[in-house]
Amino acid sequence: MAIAKGCLPSNVVPAKIKRWLESEEYSCVQIFGELARNTLFSYVVTLSPEREFVVFQPSNKNDSIHIAGALVLSADQIKKLRKKSKDEQVEIFMELRLKLASLDVEFSFEGREVCRRIGINHTIYFDGLTKDRLLKAISMFNKAYSLASWILKKSI
């Protein structure tokens, strides 16, 4: 099968992405084994001591790359959230939904009676994959993460 002009062959994508991440001085570590299950490659990238995300290619979607991570609520935030009424909790997470919906990310709220973490994912596709597109995707993830963090700090 011919590769379209400007597209990278899939066998060079992992090394190219690692090189792009390192050229921006991101700490980037490839993960293997159970932690990287169902992926063709997976890198943990550290933006700051409190912010990490994963860049990976799912084994069942060989035309896409995901930038994903989670904002984990602290024990103190969970405690404060529990003290709020159900209506107040719904209002906080409705605001989060409305603000995150305007960004090009998928998100999920995880937890039983109280949300404990917010999953954030941004997908990019191989056709025309460039360093610019990868870094813009990371920026979008970072904006969504920051926005969710700020709203939680303000609301809880």
Question: Where on the chain are the PLM-derived regions?
Answer:
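Ordered, soluble secondary-structure elements with a strong preference for glycine-centered loop motifs
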Residues: 11, 128-135
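Charge-rich, low-complexity N-terminal segments
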Residues: 1-62
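Short hydrophobic interaction/assembly module
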Residues: 55-79
